[in-house]
Amino acid sequence: MMLRGVHRIFKCFYDVVLVCAFVIALPKLLYKMLVYGKYKKSLAVRFGLKKPHVPGEGPLVWFHGASVGEVRLLLPVLEKFCEEFPGWRCLVTSCTELGVQVASQVFIPMGATVSILPLDFSIIIKSVVAKLRPSLVVFSEGDCWLNFIEEAKRIGATTLVINGRISIDSSKRFKFLKRLGKNYFSPVDGFLLQDEVQKQRFLSLGIPEHKLQVTGNIKTYVAAQTALHLERETWRDRLRLPTDSKLVILGSMHRSDAGKWLPVVQKLIKEGVSVLWVPRHVEKTKDVEESLHRLHIPYGLWSRGANFSYVPVVVVDEIGLLKQLYVAGDLAFVGGTFDPKIGGHNLLEPLQCEVPLIFGPHITSQSELAQRLLLSGAGLCLDEIEPIIDTVSFLLNNQEVREAYVQKGKVFVKAETASFDRTWRALKSYIPLYKNS
């Protein structure tokens, strides 16, 4: 009885915190809505006024990823799931409109339903979960919402985290909740984790060890690509790049990265190098334009048909293209790695496209992976001492060195694909109808 009372108090406290966070964020949300037109289409679903409709019969599996990266890693999982369990209905949700847009492009053709995730206020999410009644809920990387989890468990669903990870800062917050007598993750049935570092972090939160399995990082998984050289030529032709031209791709760029790279780009284009600049957030394109214009760097926008036949820098102001574009590059930088608050993005996409990888010193979001990349010689970390232009120029002028990085990257990715097989085998053991058959 006492535990039940504590639980009710905590749920009320959780809802109050969500309301406070929403109120604090409201001015920024309204600004983005009015200036960039964001959130308008998803308001009804976010507030539970319109519920996702998943047609058909049969049990429902609900996959959830916070944003683009978490959603994309679900692709091979859903492909395998639909292949082996065709009688199940699939729902994919994301917290961001960009995540929903990418998910729609990828998963709707597979027969899945895609939706924004309703807000996790108990009064909203309870009715949504009750209507959909999922049999299995799979969270990508750990974007777990308490009321969502508890309502899913209340109706008898199995809940699972795949490719699980938790940052140091997040683990500190959850440890604080643990001291208050609440284990946030206790309703989750299982955790399939990226590495031993993540396992130790979850153990420190009081998660029983029998719920934790280290299956590896499935962001490393990519289906066999047998014609990368043809894709490379196709994209380079589309970009109007001469055969002997060098292309540097700056992926997932943030303001902190721009500060480091703008003077480098100035020097590179004087040496005849082309640069593809891909902002992490498309709505920040105007900021990129202003920076390039201020330094008198000629550029064009992808959305307006820009190519390298008349400008040395092309800014990609459309979403969902970065992973495809990497294949055209001679060298790729992954952004978010010059800001400790961001800690980097997907380091593996360039390797999967057989392009040499460089990144900045702040890789806290995937530090264990970055260390393994460096130890294997499959990636190069830019430091604060040697000028970036020296490192980049050396790599561009030495094809043998670049090729060595590519070969080590191929070995690394091939070895890491075993992670998907382990994850899939473990996931199947949690599928309700499968484990009882």
Swiss-Prot record:
Which residue ranges run through the membrane?
A: 16-36
Q: Which residues take part in binding CMP?
A: P279, R280, I319, G320, L321, N346, L347, L348, E349
- Keyword Membrane attributed: yes
| GO annotation terms (biological process) | lipid A biosynthetic process; lipopolysaccharide core region biosynthetic process
Q: Which GO terms describe its molecular function?
A: Kdo transferase activity
Specify the effect of T234A. In strain: Koala type I
The entry's stated outcome for V6I is: In strain: Koala type I
What keywords are annotated for this sequence in UniProt?
Answer: Cell inner membrane, Cell membrane, Lipopolysaccharide biosynthesis, Membrane, Signal-anchor, Transferase, Transmembrane, Transmembrane helix
Tell me its EC number(s), please: 2.4.99.12, 2.4.99.13, 2.4.99.14
Which reaction(s) does the protein catalyse, per the Swiss-Prot or TrEMBL entry? Answer: lipid IVA (E. coli) + CMP-3-deoxy-beta-D-manno-octulosonate = alpha-Kdo-(2->6)-lipid IVA (E. coli) + CMP + H(+); alpha-Kdo-(2->6)-lipid IVA (E. coli) + CMP-3-deoxy-beta-D-manno-octulosonate = alpha-Kdo-(2->4)-alpha-Kdo-(2->6)-lipid IVA (E. coli) + CMP + H(+); alpha-Kdo-(2->4)-alpha-Kdo-(2->6)-lipid IVA (E. coli) + CMP-3-deoxy-beta-D-manno-octulosonate = alpha-Kdo-(2->8)-alpha-Kdo-(2->4)-alpha-Kdo-(2->6)-lipid IVA (E. coli) + CMP + H(+)
Per UniProt, subcellular location reads as: Cell inner membrane
For this chain, the family text in UniProt reads:
Belongs to the glycosyltransferase group 1 family. Glycosyltransferase 30 subfamily.
Main function: Involved in lipopolysaccharide (LPS) biosynthesis. Catalyzes the transfer of three 3-deoxy-D-manno-octulosonate (Kdo) residues from CMP-Kdo to lipid IV(A), the tetraacyldisaccharide-1,4'-bisphosphate precursor of lipid A. Thus generates the genus-specific LPS epitope of Chlamydia, composed of the trisaccharide alpha-Kdo-(2->8)-alpha-Kdo-(2->4)-alpha-Kdo.
Protein name per its UniProtKB record:
3-deoxy-D-manno-octulosonic acid transferase
User: Lineage of the native species?
Assistant: Bacteria, Pseudomonadati, Chlamydiota, Chlamydiia, Chlamydiales
The gene it comes from is waaA
